[in-house]
Amino acid sequence: MKRLAFGLAVVASAGVGAAPTAVAQPMVGTAVYVQIRQSFAPVDGDDQCVGTATLEPVRRGSSVVLSEGATATDSPKVAVGRFYRSRLRDGVCEALYITSAPIKPTFNVQFAGPGGELSPTFGPTPSEPVTYQPGIEQIVRVGI
């Protein structure tokens, strides 16, 4: 009986020791909606506008990099998303990026152009829950 109890104790302690110490955060559909009031140019084609100057990376073929929302610009990266589309509306260039990211109250946002050029980092920028768009559970609005 002592051997059985010892064996169960070893198995139980091995199970406790093997348990992960951190639980991965679930990833959800995330939209990054960008409004550029200056530093953009109208273009012909599928997209209606692109970023200029330091916002030149905001264009087709670019990516958005989300990192943990903090005042430090070197916070850990948590997601990378792809450019979806841009349009001009009421004199403002609107760009949309889609990604999968953990649910967080804030993010830092940076854009990477097709050639690897980087924009400044914007944030911390609050995220908001989304209930009206299937597949998208949060949105990050970046006004520039």
Each PLM stretch: what is its role?
Residues M1-A24:
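Secretory targeting and sorting signals
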Residues S75-R89, G123-S127:
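Solvent-exposed serine/threonine-rich low-complexity stretches and specific carbohydrate-binding patches
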Residues Q25-A70:
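Short, surface-exposed binding/anchoring microloops in extracellular/periplasmic proteins
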Residues A70-A72, G115:
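Solvent-exposed strand-loop boundary residues in beta-sheet-rich modules
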Residues F122-I144:
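Extracellular beta-sheet/turn segments enriched in Thr/Pro/Gly and aliphatic residues
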